[in-house]
Each structure stands twice: as C-alpha cells, then as structure tokens.
Amino acid sequence: ATGDFPRAKLYWNASANKTASNNPFFNVDAPHPYSVFHDFNHENKWVRNYVKRNLKFLLEEYNLDGFRFDLTKGFTQKSSTESNASNYDASRVAILKDYHAAIKEVKEDAFVILEHFCDSKEEKDLAADGLHLWRNVNHAYCQSAMGYSESSDFSGMYEKTPAWVGFMESHDEERMAYKQLAWPAFDSLKGDNNLENRMKQLAVNAAFML
C-alpha cells in the first residue's frame, strides 16, 4: 500500500515519511528484501480480516474468476535476506492457506495463482491446498525468439501436475522482441528489413506457449 492509503496515514511518521512504529496494520520496514511501498503485517488479525473482506467483495461484486497474488513470498513476518527469503516458512504457508480458504468459502471454483518462487517443499504444500504457482519460462522463450537452441527448452511449461502456471512474458519478465532485435542468432532476424521474420518467430513462440 502507498502512503496515501488511509490505514497508513492513521499512524504515520512524517519525519521519516513512512508508517509509524505504532501502526498495527503495517511494518515500519518490511522483514523481507522485496518490499514495494509499505508492507502489510499479515499476522495482524485486522489486516487478515481486511484482506478477506476485500477478496469477498471483489468476488461477489465483480464475479471474478479468481486472483493472482503478486510477491506472496512477502506474506510473512519472518525476517529474511535475499539468501534465505525463499526458505520454507510455515507461517507464510498458514497465511496463504487462510486467504485461500476465505476465497473458496465465497467461490468454490475460484482460481488462485501465487507469484511465489520459494522452496519446493513450500510450493508443494501450497499446491496440495489447491493453489497454483507461477513458473518463469521467459529465458527459454527469449532464447527461442533470438534463434538460439541452447537453453530454449520449454518443458517447464508442461507439468503433469496442474499446480504450476508457466508464462512466456509478464510485467516483470518482458522485452522478448527487443532481445530478438538486439541479439539475433541469424542474419535473417537482424534489422528493420527482417521485421516480418522476427514476427513469425514470435508467433511460433506464442503457438508453443498456448
């Protein structure tokens, strides 16, 4: 949440331009290394209730099919660094399962995707609860777009288990067409004169993804 969010402003440290230490909804500083804006304390019962009420409203008011949660690795109060933030965290699993249960209570067939990228045991625990996990296959598709066979294996997209949701590009992993133009493997992909060839190669990528 940003500083304009009312619950952030209720308890605000103006001199530091961030949430105050007595703010029950937010951490002063995120305990994990991936924070954007102000970090919710998902262990707090008020925050938990607030999130659940919002999920319920969105499902009922807009009849959403489900949700994709960004940075669910950060749904924790456990202090971590980049070296251990992905380690198994039972408290984070409990929080996410609680939100998932609240969603299913409103809409049994809701589809929920997590951008998680954590320990395999943790992801398997979440998958066993019916949650789906984001899987990054951007590098392989970029290699293919540029014309390189090395590291262009798409098998990460196709798992026997339905829990993983692979993606070719996202809001974080993008610029495939730029890489194709900047570092092509073949002359037939170089320059403005070969735009049609590059677009055909990208179309093949899309066909494999779909």
Task: Please describe what each predicted stretch is.
Residues 4-5, 77-78, 122, 176-179:
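Active-site-proximal flexible loops/turns
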Residues 1-63, 68-88, 99-105:
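Substrate-binding/active-site clefts of carbohydrate-active enzymes
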Residues 45, 49-56, 90-97, 162, ...:
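A structural signal for well-ordered alpha-helical segments within the folded catalytic domains
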Residues 15, 131-134, 184-189:
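Short, low-complexity, polar/charged sequence segments that are solvent-exposed and flexible
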Residues 100, 149-210:
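Active-site-proximal substrate-binding groove within the catalytic cores of carbohydrate-active enzymes
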Residues 22-23, 37-39, 123, 164-165, ...:
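Generic secondary-structure boundary/loop-capping signal
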Residues 12, 32, 71-167, 207-208:
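Active-site-proximal helices and loops of the catalytic beta/alpha 8
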Residues 34-38, 81-94, 179-199:
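Non-catalytic scaffold segments within catalytic domains of secreted glycoside hydrolases
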